């Protein structure tokens, strides 16, 4: 029974692949094809699931008022991302993650099923540990195959392969699936914060569910979507385990998996979040145990403990992992800067400058922080607009 199902699925996927190949002369089949019409079907499926969740929690006003609306925003974000990257940019990191995920699926379904499972689920550390068929196909479908040489990007491609397998290798549907799955995690953390601040629900709903850039970058096949979703799971499961003391295996498993994925993709996020989590736990404990006067005395101590924890953690990681060393961070910062400047010169993107010959010492970082945060949060600025996409981003 299961063998027949797998065989039929392989035949159907093969048929879809042939349809994509036939459209190769008029379309870019790696990014969009006739298979994307399944997006309508998947939207209905995701809507029915979202509506079912809202009905199941109809006694909760948050789900009743915000859940389905937030779902619509996410789907709009996924569609917008798909349109811009598939039709305007015609590529990018997101498309590359997706393409290599499709290659993994094709290898598993049509070349070597057992080894394909190994490739997708094992901790691959580089292109040398991949089958030559995958390496050759990846180089063919996208430039130099650089994703396969980056362990973090390779993990994103493997996650994409798992999701795109159930989306019939459609980039549109895979973006929608990423957006929907991340939305479930985001709404969990949103509901938790609303318990902390019941008088600020409207503001929290805007921050979690309605900020355009947050929706756009968190609704597609990319690192940000995975990290945001897993960070929400990390915070939520941490609260359940260490604040509410609900010591259930599901929360422990969720905490371990989310921490692993975030640390593997963007390790600095875990480094930054850990002191905040510890302070959050300490504050909750002190509110339960100490009186008002003692709490006021205890607060500065907690801030000092949090800062000390961050400093010690950073020092430890910089010695253990070379990517946290000052030299490595400086090289990466210069790399990001030069990449953005190249994009600005080559394709009319927005660049930035924090000054020349920056030494990246702690004092310099503190001095440059206001300008860097302003650029990160509010750029590109209206006077930097060079095309329609930049105009939308600026708005």
Each model region followed by its residue ranges:
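Transmembrane-helix motifs of polytopic, lipid-linked glycan transferases
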Residues: 49-54, 160-162, 174-196
């Amino acid at each position: 029974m299961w063998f027949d199902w797998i065989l039929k699925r392989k035949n159907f996927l093969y048929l879809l692949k042939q349809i994509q190949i036939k459209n190769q002369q008029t379309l870019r089949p790696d990014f969009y094809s006739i298979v994307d019409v399944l997006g309508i079907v998947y939207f209905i499926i995701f809507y029915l699931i979202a509506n079912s969740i809202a009905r199941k929690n109809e006694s909760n006003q948050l789900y009743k008022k915000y859940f389905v609306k937030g779902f619509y925003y996410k789907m709009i974000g996924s569609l917008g991302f798909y349109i811009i990257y598939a039709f305007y940019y015609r590529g990018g990191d997101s498309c590359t993650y997706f393409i290599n995920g499709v290659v993994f699926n094709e290898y598993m379904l049509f070349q070597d099923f057992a080894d394909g499972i190994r490739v997708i689920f094992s901790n691959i550390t580089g292109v040398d540990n991949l089958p030559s068929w995958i390496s050759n196909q990846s180089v063919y479908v996208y430039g130099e195959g650089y994703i396969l040489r980056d362990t973090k990007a390779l993990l994103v491609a493997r996650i994409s392969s798992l999701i795109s397998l159930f989306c019939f290798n459609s980039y549109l549907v895979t973006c929608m699936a990423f957006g929907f799955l991340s939305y479930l995690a985001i709404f969990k953390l949103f509901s938790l914060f609303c318990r902390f601040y019941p008088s600020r629900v409207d503001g929290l709903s805007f921050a979690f569910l309605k900020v355009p850039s947050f929706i756009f970058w968190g609704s597609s096949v990319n690192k940000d979507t995975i990290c945001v979703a897993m960070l929400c799971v990390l915070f939520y499961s941490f609260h359940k385990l260490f604040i509410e003391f609900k010591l259930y295996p599901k929360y422990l498993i969720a905490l371990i998996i989310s921490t692993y994925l975030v640390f593997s993709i963007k390790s600095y996020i875990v480094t930054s979040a850990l002191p905040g989590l510890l302070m959050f736990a300490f504050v909750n404990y002190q509110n339960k145990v100490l009186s008002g006067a003692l709490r006021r005395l205890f607060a500065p101590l907690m801030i000092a403990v949090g800062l000390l924890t961050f400093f010690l953690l950073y020092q430890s990681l910089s010695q253990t992992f070379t990517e946290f060393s000052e030299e490595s961070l400086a090289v990466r910062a210069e790399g990001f800067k030069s990449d953005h400047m190249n994009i600005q010169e080559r394709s009319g993107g927005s660049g930035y400058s924090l000054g020349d010959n920056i030494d990246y010492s702690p004092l310099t970082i503190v001095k440059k922080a206001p300008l860097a945060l302003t650029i990160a949060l509010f750029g590109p600025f209206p006077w930097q607009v060079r095309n329609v996409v930049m105009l939308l981003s600026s708005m």
